[in-house]
Each structure stands twice: as structure tokens, then as C-alpha cells.
Amino acid sequence: MKNYQFSTALLSSQIQGKKLRFPCPAKINLFLYITSQRPDGYHELQTLFQFLNFGDWLSIEIRTDGKIILTSEIPHLKNEDNLIYRAAKLLQQKTGCTLGANLHLDKILPIGGGVGGGSSNAATALVALNYLWNTQLSLSTLAEIGLQLGADVPVFVYGKAAFAEGVGEKLTFCQPPQKWFLVLKPETSISTAIIFKDPNLPRNTPKRPLAELLITKYENDCEKVVLNHYSEVEEALGWLLQYAPARLTGTGACVFAEFANEQAAQSAFLDKPEKYVGFVAQGTNISPLHQMIEYLSQQKQTLCLPNNTNSRG
């Protein structure tokens, strides 16, 4: 896996080019508790999302003909089914914007790892195109569009670390400690259907206020069930636990260990077995995507936008 982190230098060095590259940050679930199962089968939860300064890159170049042209490094996925393409089309439909875009995804995050890659890609497309096309939708409106693409898309749209409740739609922004993490992807993919159908999955963890959860040991209710079904995840987690507190993110397959500083995380990373892909990154309570949008706004960059093309419909 390509191993570099987002930074201001990486963001600022590209500004003079015709294309802009926007970060699609990973996320981790610092904790995840399942509090109930609704009659419709959906599970209610309490979870804490934090972004990482590591992820995919989405390159964007504006077109004047309204076409959305996407190239990516994801095999066997039609563009029409890609969340990036769908996000761009939904934004056009919502705003009546007549501009288009050339989009290229530099895929770095592991697919199916539970670190939010697809949701982050969709959110970056929405937020970045809203900025570049000057469609001026609010984040709440973009989040509503994003919810059509996936339950986790809104948290990436808002770009702040968040405590999520319900089925993930109730968000409370917060500021957990920004630690360093070593994230590993075992050589397996998780079936969420298998996990959520397992009778041993906890479904009645008592709801607790955020203030209490933040000072309690963080756990993931899905972890034991995932480990029972996937020995590869159990092995990877066991390896991480030699170095630091570690657990599953989401339903996996990625697992992560938390460290107080980068040096300790990098030291463990150097010992990583070759069969694991992984990366070291710092948690951040403000999404690198939103940091870049803010940077562009502060620099007052003059983007080559055609005149009179912003139609709100």
C-alpha cells in the first residue's frame, strides 16, 4: 500500500496546476456499541468516528460540457455504480449546474476494510464539486444528498469527528484525543450480513451519555463475533496487541492499535509481517478535506471557472 500522509505541503504544492487533488480521508470507529435492533431489522448503535490524515486522493478538473468522466483504480466496478460518479450526478441534478468534471481516483485505502473509503470518496466528490462549481449548497444539504449514497457519507461531508447514534444519522460533534494509529488490513473480507445475523452479536448494550463513554475503555461490540468467524482478523489483532491497545474498526476487516506518538507507531509498523498491508496515521478531528477547502478559501485562489455557468435550477 502507498504510504504517505496528508499534509499542508502536499495540499499547497499542487495549487498551481490545472487539476486539484482533494483528500478522501480514512475514518476509524474508536468505539462501537449496538444498543438495540429495530422491528425493520436495522441495528441502533453508539459509535465515535474520527478521521485519519491518510486516505485516497480525488483529482478534479472542471469541464464546460456538463459531462462527468471518471477514471479509477478499482477493478470490476462500473463508473455508473461508483459512488463518486453518482455523487457528481446527484449534485448536478440538485443544483441544475451545467458544468462537468474529469475525476480520477487514486485508490490507496484497502477496499472493504471498514475505514470508510467509498463513503469518503462520495463525500469528497460532493464537497469539492460544490466548491469548484460554486453551487453554494450548505453542508446540511450536501449531507442529505450523501445519505442517499450511504449511511456514513454525512459524517464525511460535515468533516468533524462525531458521536453517532440511532442507525448513524444522529451526529454530535466532539473532540476525542488525536492519537497516532497503526492500521492493518488482514487478507480477508468481512460479510456484514454474517456478522449482524449472528445470534451471539450483542444487541442490547445499555445506552450511555457521550461524557461517560469518552472516559470508559473503548470497545467494539462486533469484535468478538468477527474474530470467531475470521481467524485472519484474530491473528492480525493479536499481533497488534503485542505493541499497544488494539481493536476492530466498524465490522472490519481492518484493525488498529493506538499510540501516544508517531515514533512508537512507526516502530511497530517496521515490524509488520509482510502479509499485512497497513499504514500509520494520526487521528484528526477536522477532516483533511475541509482543511484543504479552508486553505483554498484563505488563499483566494482564482480557479478557471467559466462565466455564467452556475445555474441553481
From Swiss-Prot:
ATP binds at P110, I111, G112, G113, G114, V115, G116, G117, G118, S119, S120. The lineage of its organism: Bacteria, Pseudomonadati, Pseudomonadota, Gammaproteobacteria, Pasteurellales. Pathway: Isoprenoid biosynthesis; isopentenyl diphosphate biosynthesis via DXP pathway; isopentenyl diphosphate from 1-deoxy-D-xylulose 5-phosphate: step 3/6. Belongs to the GHMP kinase family. IspE subfamily. It is an enzyme of class 2 (transferase). The keyword NAD does not apply. GO terms for biological process: isopentenyl diphosphate biosynthetic process, methylerythritol 4-phosphate pathway; terpenoid biosynthetic process. It catalyses: 4-CDP-2-C-methyl-D-erythritol + ATP = 4-CDP-2-C-methyl-D-erythritol 2-phosphate + ADP + H(+). This is 4-diphosphocytidyl-2-C-methyl-D-erythritol kinase. Its EC number is 2.7.1.148. The active site is at K27, D152. It comes from Histophilus somni (strain 129Pt) (Haemophilus somnus). The gene is ispE. The keyword ATP-binding applies. Disulfide bonds: none annotated. GO terms for molecular function: 4-(cytidine 5'-diphospho)-2-C-methyl-D-erythritol kinase activity; ATP binding. Catalyzes the phosphorylation of the position 2 hydroxy group of 4-diphosphocytidyl-2C-methyl-D-erythritol. Keywords: ATP-binding, Isoprene biosynthesis, Kinase, Nucleotide-binding, Transferase.
